[in-house]
Design a protein with these regions (language model features):
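Extracytoplasmic/secreted proteins, especially bacterial periplasmic and envelope-associated proteins
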Residues: 83, 87-90, 116, 120, ...
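N-terminal hydrophobic or amphipathic helices and topogenic motifs
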Residues: 2-120, 126, 334-413
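Short, glycine-/small- and polar/acidic-enriched structural segments
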Residues: 36-222, 238-244, 267
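Second-shell loop/turn segments in exported
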Residues: 75-76, 110-111, 183-189, 236-237, ...
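Periplasmic peptidoglycan-binding/tethering modules of Gram-negative envelope proteins
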Residues: 364, 377-452, 526-529
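Periplasmic OmpA-like peptidoglycan-binding domain that tethers envelope proteins to the cell wall
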Residues: 458-529
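Secondary-structure end/capping motifs
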Residues: 281-365
Length: 529
């Protein structure tokens, strides 16, 4: 998962390189045959002082039964090249724990291995060559079936960061919503966070099951984000799920735009550390100190640029300015954010990602969520961080100008529902039934925590068409109140009463036939994307 944001000057140079590549060759795109996700006989780049022994077979290794309690207590940790791991690098000050570093002062030993291939790192974790690995929650859910097949129990006790603009979906200018994807040629890096993001939106849309299957089955699977980005700018794709710097390129181009990026959701892609459960259970104090070291580093690392250059090759030639710009794509997570995320957000995101992978034919272990997010290691630090308050829900500052703009722009994601109200009132006919329907929408609103939510009430009325009906407005307000009562910032919500101006079936039909006219439409909009 290599992602970075170049400065403006860097973007010009890199974009010129992409154009040169496109002009200099005929770029073909085709669907890839799905690889065996358990195969590990590819060459793997491992940069470290002690080499990881990679699996030489095409089979999933069996979880090691070695007695971790009798080994030297060293955390063998794999990380891919991503800016979000920087506090860990800073706390260690090298591939091995440096004398006087944060981890050294805490009395723990960490060996960092740079492995960009999640297949290789997961096999090393299963075999016991690694005690921990850095993965997104998306990736962890993808690997959960593999871990279960190998008999490996894991825990994910800490998250270092969330993607905050580093990942997204770029599209041609005429594609403005998830619904527009039905006839589009969409490219994704196979089995990536970007692919999971696209499928998540499809799964949570109002598209028919047939339309969803068509889109998912026709995704163009590419090897990586670089190939996906190049295919998009070569004109071979209408839509590409990718990460930086390709989002910036789309923003700078004349006929493309960012359909969605993770500034509008700080929960869709979370980066954390997965430990073997046997290691964590045998050395809980070591795991807690490791987490403490991350939190300490958060206060210090931003003035240091050399450590990441020395450890991660992709940053070796980057200027301080470029590294600082790249940091903006990852929002760091402290003690309070971890407590909140582990307890409230992670089970929901994990379940959604299991839905994603199952919808494309992968096997996952849903029950892992019952033990994966063990808060005991973080909460062992509660005395030290007791003064750190749990962060309030993300506040989206929306100006009146943006509210007006939101009314006129297309919705990135639209969902409709039918809620029964008492006749001629704005009161739910059945509170429990209404809650069961709206809870799905509230969960989406919590995940897409940077979007504007437009709630529109509609009526069935066989008479003169009119807009702004007070009853439909009041019913939309009732739905808004439910959202607010369940933790959604009222400032994010726009209420519209359509009266009967947007009926979609004959209003003279039966009560059952005219239910679509009584629907509530909920739009998730990305103003400024």
């Amino acid at each position: 998962m290599k992602r970075y944001k170049a400065t403006f000057a860097g973007r010009i140079v890199l974009f010129a390189i992409i154009i040169a590549v496109v002009v200099g060759c005929v770029f073909g795109v085709s669907k890839f045959v799905k690889p065996n996700k358990d195969a590990t006989n590819e060459s793997v780049k491992v940069i470290e002082t002690t080499k990881i022994n990679k699996n030489e077979t095409n089979k999933v290794p069996v979880a090691s039964n070695k007695d971790v309690t009798n080994e030297d207590v060293t955390i063998n940790l794999s990380l891919d090249e991503w800016i979000g791991w920087e506090p860990i690098l800073y706390a260690n000050q090298g591939f091995e724990t440096k004398d006087g570093s944060i981890f050294d002062e805490l009395g723990i030993d960490v060996k960092i291995h740079i492995i960009n291939d999640a297949d290789a790192s997961s096999n090393a974790l299963i075999k016991g060559d690694l005690s921990a690995a850095g993965y997104t929650l998306n990736r962890t859910s993808f690997l959960s079936g593999k871990f279960a097949d190998a008999g490996l129990d894991v825990v994910m006790p800490v998250f270092t960061n969330y993607s905050d603009g580093g990942d997204g979906i770029i599209a041609m200018s005429n594609i403005t919503s998830i619904e527009d994807l039905v006839s589009a040629k969409i490219g994704v890096p196979k089995f990536s966070e970007a692919q999971s993001m696209v499928v998540w939106f499809i799964n949570n849309s109002d598209l028919t099951d047939e339309q969803k299957s068509t889109i998912i089955n026709n995704l163009v699977l590419l090897d990586d984000a670089e190939q996906t980005g190049q295919a998009f700018f070569a004109g071979s794709l209408d839509v590409a799920a990718t990460w930086q710097p390709y989002l910036s390129y789309a923003e700078d181009s004349t006929d493309s735009h960012i359909l969605f990026d993770t500034t509008f959701s700080n929960k869709l892609i979370l980066d954390g550390i997965v430990f073997r459960s046997d290691f964590a259970e045998a050395h809980p104090d070591v795991v807690s100190k490791f987490i403490d070291g991350i939190f300490i580093a958060l206060e210090e690392y931003e003035s240091d640029f050399d450590t990441i250059r020395n450890i991660m090759p992709m940053f070796a030639g980057m200027s301080d300015e470029d590294i600082a710009a790249t940091r903006m794509d990852a929002g760091m997570m402290d003690y309070a954010a971890n407590v909140k995320t582990l307890e409230n957000d992670c089970p929901i995101i994990y379940s959604d990602m299991c839905d994603v992978w199952e919808s494309i034919g992968e096997t996952v272990n849903r029950s892992l969520s019952e033990t994966l997010f063990d808060t005991s290691y973080v909460k062992d630090l509660s005395d030290k961080y007791s003064s750190v308050t749990v962060p309030a829900p993300k506040v989206v500052e929306i100006t009146e100008e943006q509210r007006t703009e939101a009314l006129d722009i297309p919705s990135m994601l639209t969902k409709s529902c039918t809620i029964e109200f008492h006749p001629d009132t704005a009161k739910f006919q059945d509170n429990a039934e209404a809650a069961a329907i709206l809870d799905e929408f509230v969960e989406i609103a919590k995940i897409l925590d940077g979007t504007i939510i437009q709630i529109e009430g509609n009526l069935n009325y066989n008479g003169k068409i009119y807009s702004g009906d007070s009853l439909s407005t009041k019913r939309a307000e009732t739905v808004k109140k439910y959202f607010v009562a369940n933790g959604i910032d009222a400032n994010r919500i726009i209420v519209v009463g359509n009266g009967n101006s947007k009926m979609i079936v004959d209003p003279a039909g039966s009560v059952e036939d005219t239910m679509p006219n009584r629907r509530t439409d909920i739009f998730f909009k990305t103003v400024g994307a």
